[in-house]
Amino acid sequence: MAPLKKPAVKGGKKKKQVLKFTLDCTHPVEDGIMDAANFEQFLQERIKVNGKAGNLGGGVVSIERSKSKITVTSDIPFSKRYLKYLTKKYLKKNNLRDWLRVVANTKESYELRYFQINQDEEEEEDED
């Protein structure tokens, strides 16, 4: 009996992986304590591609802003955690870290929320 030949598997090209992350800054922007355009500029200056900040890899990473939402799109591997790190760095720089926190509301997005301050109300009730 003749040996069976396995059919040749053609190696197709991998699909280009496009990563899209969203940062929702609606609450602080509406309250006027944060400027979305300033935050967008901060991200453009700080995001590193191939170890270099500020160049965004010649178009492989793009940042778009629509009102108070910032969208970061990347053709190369890009960490959502890195986006959170940069957001926290921006908040610290602008002295907003004490009032705002970065929360993941979906798998592809973060949201800036205020800290819930319920402890002060409970302490006041206990003193009565």
Swiss-Prot record:
Q: Which GO terms describe its cellular component?
A: cytoplasm; ribonucleoprotein complex; ribosome
Q: Does the keyword Ribosomal protein apply?
A: yes
> Which cellular compartments is it found in?
Cytoplasm
The protein's UniProt keywords, in alphabetical order, are: Cytoplasm, Ribonucleoprotein, Ribosomal protein
Domain of life, per UniProt, equals Eukaryota
Cytoplasm as a keyword of this entry, yes or no, is yes
Write out the GO MF terms. Answer: RNA binding; structural constituent of ribosome
- Which PANTHER family does the annotation name? 60S RIBOSOMAL PROTEIN L22 (PTHR10064), LARGE RIBOSOMAL SUBUNIT PROTEIN EL22 (PTHR10064:SF2)
Per UniProt, subunit arrangement is: Component of the large ribosomal subunit.
**Task of the protein:** Component of the large ribosomal subunit. The ribosome is a large ribonucleoprotein complex responsible for the synthesis of proteins in the cell.
Its recorded name reads Large ribosomal subunit protein eL22
Give the originating organism. Answer: Ictalurus punctatus
